[in-house]
């Protein structure tokens, strides 16, 4: 089956509809179903003891395995040819978030550009974990741009990459891994051991997509050479083995600095800067970042479309 064509169908539906509120109220969302399973298993299995890491490994394997097996069973029942591609694309649609990502960051950009800092702080609190009350205009712009860059990889390029590789099991399995990491893959007393496997697996499956995302941002920039140079120089200085690639490419493309120190509700993170000699982002840079995002995602879609065409004629 042409998995790349299936992903193109999913992209098209997502761009046209997003995930409608009426549908969410009626059936929820597949990621929330996965999250409920994780929460239930974590509640029963995450307790102190010398086997805490092993229990976390088993929970991660159970969640990923359950998701992949269900998705594989559904995929095996799809009809052959283009009807199967169309149905598969509809089923993959909930795992794609191009429109949602753009809308969430645009909701920050609108009040920030208008000078409404409280409104921008409220909007950015929906997409980042840091304390918004401490953020000035450059801080809000920086937080939103970092979220846009990192989540373009985690929420868009990575699931589509694995969808192209393995179809429904690939895209659904990736989302299970990413949801595990977002819920239990934290370096806290509660999750350091229990979430160890989830965090490591997430790092592994994002190795290629994160670098591809950085490349898409760099190639979509009018200043390709600078974006590529900043990415190559600074990406590895990020605390994450993967997030630095799209963030550094974004920083180079927009000629701003990203990452750096930030305040969370429970801690202060003193991170190195990406493109540290550049100025802080301004509100207008957030609009430029959204334009870069649109070009990069258009380029990604074109690449997937070309893969689909080559697949169909091979």
UniProtKB/Swiss-Prot annotation:
Keyword line: Cell membrane, Cobalamin biosynthesis, Membrane, Transmembrane, Transmembrane helix
A Pfam family per the record: CobD_Cbib
Keyword Amino-acid biosynthesis assigned: no
InterPro entries assigned: Cobalamin_biosynth_CobD/CbiB
Claim: Lipoprotein is one of the keywords in the record: no
Bilayer topology: Multi-pass membrane protein
Chief localization: membrane
GO cellular component, one term: plasma membrane
Pathway where this protein functions: Cofactor biosynthesis; adenosylcobalamin biosynthesis
Described function: Converts cobyric acid to cobinamide by the addition of aminopropanol on the F carboxylic group.
Family of the protein in this entry: Belongs to the CobD/CbiB family.
Protein name listed in UniProt: Cobalamin biosynthesis protein CobD
Organism: Rhodobacter capsulatus (Rhodopseudomonas capsulata)
Lineage, broadest ranks: Bacteria, Pseudomonadati, Pseudomonadota, Alphaproteobacteria, Rhodobacterales
